[in-house]
Amino acid sequence: MGLESYHSDHDRYPYGTEAPFNNHGVAVANGEEYSSNVVYMALFGDHKNEGVPSRDTTIYNDELNPSTQPKSNPTVREVHVKSKDGRPVTLYILADPWGSPYRYRLGSEQSIPTRTDRARNLKMGNGLNPDYDFWSFGKDGDSDLKDPHAPENEDDIGNLPKF
């Protein structure tokens, strides 16, 4: 599995703001709409969101190559969004079979490695699981991120092992 291999090599799961990732702060591992971009960048090695792996990078999942995706039902979709400062940004996200973005969130036991003693091992993850949450809103495309037992979550597909 790509995320486990990434974790083995880096001693952490990807969180989206670390170098060399360049998504202009639009996508981080918080479960929001474009959060699967973090998984795409980490596993395919496309650190600049150009649709190709960065030079001299490890590709953990070559099935995420946008140029080889089936046109009828691609796993990787190109989306155009605005950065925090209003500039247009292209992102590649992972899409479920219904065309909606997968969601990715760091787990409750995950932390951001930092260089300062004051902020060392700052907890970032707020997932339901200790490592990470990776899920689809399901066929209805709706979910309640705050209440895992909400009725709209009944068709959600959680912690997918695919990536």
Annotated model-derived regions:
Residues M1-F163:
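N-terminal pilin/flagellin-like segments and related low-complexity appendage regions
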